[in-house]
Design a protein with these regions (language model features):
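Beta1-alpha1 glycine-rich phosphate/pyrophosphate-binding loop at the start
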Residues: 1-61, 88, 126-170, 177-178, ...
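Generic beta-strand/beta-sheet core signal
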Residues: 17-19, 58, 80-82, 95, ...
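Feature captures the FAD/FMN-dependent oxidoreductase FAD-binding
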Residues: 42-93, 176-184, 210-212, 217-223
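Glycine-rich dinucleotide-binding loop and its adjacent helix/turn
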Residues: 46-64, 87-138, 232-243, 247
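FAD-site-proximal beta/loop scaffold in flavoenzymes
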Residues: 96-116, 193, 198-261
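A conserved FAD-binding loop/helix module that cradles the flavin
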Residues: 131, 257-286
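Active-site rim loops that border cofactor/substrate pockets in soluble metabolic enzymes
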Residues: 161, 180-195
Length: 290
């Protein structure tokens, strides 16, 4: 969104490819309505279209169309801002059970899932807080977040809001598997520095109508697999240089697909810098052509 607006303001014709049915990416499908009303995105889209920006929904780059085909068709520069929308799995028994969900999948369509009264959430990040608050707003009465250590990766304000909404927090719980009854943990043993030094032998079965895994998310690798010369880092992130250009000339990237899951503010900052770099690249290319 940010890159499209910056390029349009600079006078460039812009097309945005959205792989889902509604425009907005993570803002549309990963942030709850109570935090970001969908009407805001609708107004934003209308404003972008007024600026002359074309938005193509239900179009996946990397399967329906390829980056090479975009370059073939005359696009002077391409920006990849696909984010990190693939849920990270635990790799444990029970993740495929019918009463188990991943956080981002739930947030994309919370009213489409019947969680029941009791919900166990694995994770303590900002996304996990969104999941908990959304579940409470959609009828679940007992929502508990579980973490292995005593550290919380979510911001203190998000934790406070989640507590005010009625969620509970349990620390020192190492998940081993998930059953139809709910998650199974082993309690962690801490030393005086709150460091984990072991686990109790007896497993603890938690009874939950639904278990939601919300530990993190990572970028999908489809674009790298389908685009020659587009490389990833050891972490599976899009590799870019100091000007946000990828290893494929003319193709840029920023946001979670480059940094891993971070805040929207961080993604917007990177997008602004990437847009400026794209403009410099295209202006230089135009000068050399003339």
């Amino acid at each position: 969104m940010t890159v499209a607006i910056k390029l349009a303001e600079a006078g460039y014709p812009v097309t945005v490819f959205e792989w889902k049915g509604k425009f907005g990416g993570l803002l549309q499908y990963g942030i709850p309505e109570f935090r970001l009303p969908k009407s805001f995105l609708e107004r934003y889209q209308a404003r972008m279209e007024e600026m002359g920006i074309t938005i193509r929904t239900n179009t996946t780059i990397g399967s329906v169309l390829m980056i090479d085909e975009l370059l073939r068709d005359g696009y002077s520069s391409i920006f990849i801002g696909t984010g990190a929308e693939k849920p990270r799995t635990l790799g444990l028994q029970g993740e495929s059970l019918g009463n188990v969900l991943f956080g981002l999948n739930y947030l994309a369509n919370p009213r489409g899932h019947k969680l029941g009264d009791t919900v166990a959430i694995i994770g303590m990040g900002n996304a996990a807080m969104d999941v908990a608050r959304t579940a409470l707003r959609n009828g679940s009465r007992h929502v508990t977040l579980y973490a292995r250590s005593k550290n919380v990766t979510a911001s203190s304000s998000e934790v406070s809001y989640t507590e005010l909404d009625g969620a509970e927090f349990v620390f020192g719980m190492h998940i081993e598997k998930i059953t139809d009854e709910g998650p199974v943990f082993r309690k962690a043993v801490f030393n005086e520095k709150d460091e984990i030094i072991g686990y109790e032998e007896e497993p603890v079965q938690i009874h939950a109508d639904s278990t939601i895994i919300s530990i993190s998310q990572v970028p999908r690798r489809k674009l790298a697999r389908t685009t020659e010369g587009l490389e990833l880092t050891d972490r599976g992130l899009l590799e870019v240089d100091e000007n946000y250009m990828t290893t494929r000339p003319g193709v840029f990237g920023a946001g979670d697909v480059v940094t891993g899951a971070k805040t929207v503010v961080h993604a917007v900052d990177g997008a602004k810098k990437a847009a400026a770099a794209m403009i410099r690249y295209m202006e230089r290319d135009l000068t050399e052509t003339n």
